């Protein structure tokens, strides 16, 4: 509506005529319309809400708050008695929220982040009545970096200053500046409601064809044509490169480049790190790469409502400045081995992958350590006996390191890591001699004390070394009766009598004892 028509609506009538004024939420302000005597309140309000599906702010209709209802009623009778009619049951008053949420708490913060960058004002230095959520602001800044509006240290670029002057979301502004007028049709579709009925399929090219073929309702087509004309005037006319529909949408949604996951289901990982899925049987369900412009907003795995296919070469051309090769060593749970890869990455998606042939031993060992934590520690009998000896003395009060399996896994980076050189698989780990690694945990003095108080063997009067079994709580040995002849003092191990099981000449247990002679 033109400004003069708006002025005429609120000017007093001089000839006594009655008039009807349709007003937005501006009527909740201190605006006085002198001859208004009656207010009819629908109980609804239009609010700016961040639409997680489109990644932009949308206007949605919600229940008004009690505070808004009071303000609206106050427009009647500003200078004379008046009446307010509320189009809801009186009993519903208690269900209305007390106040409307601050827009900064619910809207997309991309525009705010861009304005703050233009001002050069750090958000934390501004006295917001309702400060923006740090996570939401950070997400907005990351998007602006992808759009080339901010530098890595969050400073505004010349491109960002230009986007800030455009009367539309930075996503669409960036697309129109990079692609030019050719993007005005798809920008108009992205900036309005879906022109096709639900169930028509996700492919955005269907929307473009419907607009061009005249298969849309007259009002919808007129609205889109009007929006297309408006956006053509905002587009840069310096771009002459012809781009596919997928490439143009990718300019607006660099965080929504989707790569199909392995498997039969049409599930995708997006360059921004989130997951999304197409409906089974959708025309795009076999596409290896897509650009997603609208979802249902599910934070776990969103259902894709609008998307378009894009080629790998197009992705590499459009985002050459954001694509990088990354090297990684990771433990593969499926392969039970360390996998060293060089990956061509755009955010969270992998465009190409190769074997990292010259991965450093330190990186491989660190990845193997993650495998150890997943697999657990499997000790051989000698390793288990040593560990048990230390634990037995520690439980008796000796100042020794904790060698429980839980503690050993938690501290593996300090004692096991140096011994993992050359170990890459679960089979190699199983064959690794851990005894030396376990012994390295003790100082020389601690090692001597363990050997003295909890020896690995005892020597009989006949001179034979018998291994001590520490795995059953109380240290014990088994030997033939004759080998104890000449014993005058019962052996003490770990501060307690050694349990001796005497065997017959045939090797059968005769008697366990802790008191010889």
Regions found by a protein language model. Name each.
Residues 20-29, 42, 74, 157:
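Ser/Thr-glycine-rich phosphate-binding loops at phosphate-binding pockets of nucleotides
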Residues 8, 40, 48, 88-432:
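Second RecA-like catalytic domain
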Residues 11-16, 31-33, 78-79:
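Conserved catalytic network of the ASCE P-loop NTPase/AAA+ motor domain
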Residues 7-9, 21, 26-31, 35-36, ...:
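N-terminal helicase ATP-binding lobe
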Residues 432, 436, 440-517:
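C-terminal structured domains
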Residues 1-21:
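Conserved motor-coupling elements within RecA-like helicase/translocase cores
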């Amino acid at each position: 509506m033109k400004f003069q028509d708006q002025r005429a609506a609120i000017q007093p009538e001089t000839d006594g005529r009655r008039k009807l004024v349709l007003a937005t939420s501006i009527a909740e302000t201190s605006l006085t319309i002198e001859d208004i005597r009656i207010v009819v309140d629908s109980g609804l309000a239009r609010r700016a809400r961040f639409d997680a599906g489109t990644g932009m702010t949308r206007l949605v209709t919600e229940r008004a708050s009690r505070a808004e209802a009071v303000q609206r009623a106050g427009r009647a009778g500003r200078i004379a008695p008046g009446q307010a009619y509320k189009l809801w049951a009186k009993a519903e008053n208690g269900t209305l929220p007390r106040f409307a949420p601050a827009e900064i708490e619910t809207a997309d913060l991309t525009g705010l982040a861009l304005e703050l960058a233009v001002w050069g004002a750090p958000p934390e230095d501004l006295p917001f009545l309702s400060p923006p959520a740090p996570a939401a602001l950070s997400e907005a800044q990351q998007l602006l970096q992808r759009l080339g509006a901010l530098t890595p240290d969050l400073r505004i670029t010349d491109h960002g200053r230009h986007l800030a002057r455009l009367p539309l979301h930075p996503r669409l502004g960036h697309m129109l500046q990079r692609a030019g007028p050719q993007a005005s049709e798809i920008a108009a579709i992205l900036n309005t409601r879906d022109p096709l009925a639900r169930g028509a399929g996700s492919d955005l090219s269907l929307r473009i064809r419907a607009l061009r073929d005249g298969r849309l309702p007259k009002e919808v087509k007129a609205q889109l044509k009007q929006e297309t004309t408006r956006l053509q005037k905002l587009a840069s006319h310096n771009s002459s490169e012809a781009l596919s529909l997928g490439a143009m949408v990718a300019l607006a949604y660099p965080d929504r480049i989707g790569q199909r996951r392995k498997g039969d289901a049409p599930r995708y990982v997006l360059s921004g790190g989130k997951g999304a899925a197409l409906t089974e049987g959708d025309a795009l369900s076999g596409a290896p790469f897509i650009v997603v412009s609208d979802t249902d907003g599910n934070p776990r795995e969103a259902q894709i409502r609008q998307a378009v296919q894009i080629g790998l070469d197009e992705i590499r051309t459009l985002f050459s400045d954001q694509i990088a090769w990354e090297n990684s060593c990771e433990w593969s749970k499926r392969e039970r081995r360390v996998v060293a890869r060089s990956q061509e990455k755009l955010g969270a998606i992998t465009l190409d992958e190769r074997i990292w042939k010259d991965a450093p031993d330190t990186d491989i060992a660190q990845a193997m350590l993650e495998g150890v934590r997943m697999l657990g520690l499997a000790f051989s009998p000698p390793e288990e006996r040593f560990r048990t000896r230390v634990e037995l003395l520690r439980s008796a009060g000796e100042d020794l390191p904790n060698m429980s399996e839980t503690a050993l896994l938690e501290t593996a980076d300090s004692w096991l890591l140096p011994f993992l050189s050359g170990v890459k698989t679960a089979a190699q780990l199983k064959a690794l001699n851990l005894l030396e690694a376990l012994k390295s945990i003790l100082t020389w003095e601690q090692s001597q004390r363990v050997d003295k108080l909890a020896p690995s063997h005892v020597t009989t009067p006949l001179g034979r070394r018998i291994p001590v079994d520490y795995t059953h709580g109380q240290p014990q040995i088994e030997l033939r009766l004759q080998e104890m002849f000449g014993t005058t003092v019962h052996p003490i191990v770990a501060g307690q009598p050694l349990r001796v099981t005497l065997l017959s000449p045939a090797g059968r247990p005769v008697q366990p004892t802790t008191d010889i002679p």
